[in-house]
Amino acid sequence: DATQHWLIAEAPSPVGFAKYSYQQRMADDGKIGTLLHKLYLMPGKTGHRYGEHIFHAVETRAKTAGESWLWLEVLAANPAARRFYERQGMQHIRDTTFHSASQQSTLHILAKPI
């Protein structure tokens, strides 16, 4: 998909990645910005600031692309991830519910003007 971008961090081998898309509308409020779909670190690679570096690299790319917002959804069941994103300057906007045939999950929508 040409609208999705990937960033792979290496030090010297792969330590993690981010998947993000520009010009994505935050549901219900009309703001448009870069949606950070995923930020993932390999097992054993947390605690070395790799996540911060990957996050800030995505933020820099979004600014360079002319975006005004960086936003994401994080599972309510993952408070450590929410704390990480809040340390990066993200703020809680609202909650939404994800429904599938087999589950229902609360998602926190976090955003940051950039």
What positions do the PLM features span?
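Short coil/turn segments at alpha/beta junctions that flank glycine-rich nucleotide-binding fingerprints
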Residues: 48, 65-68
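Short, solvent-exposed loop/helix junctions and linker helices
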Residues: 48-49, 104
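Active-site acidic-Proline motif in GNAT/NAT acetyltransferases
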Residues: 42-44, 48, 76-77
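C-terminal "cap" of GNAT-fold acetyltransferases
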Residues: 30-34, 68-82, 86-114
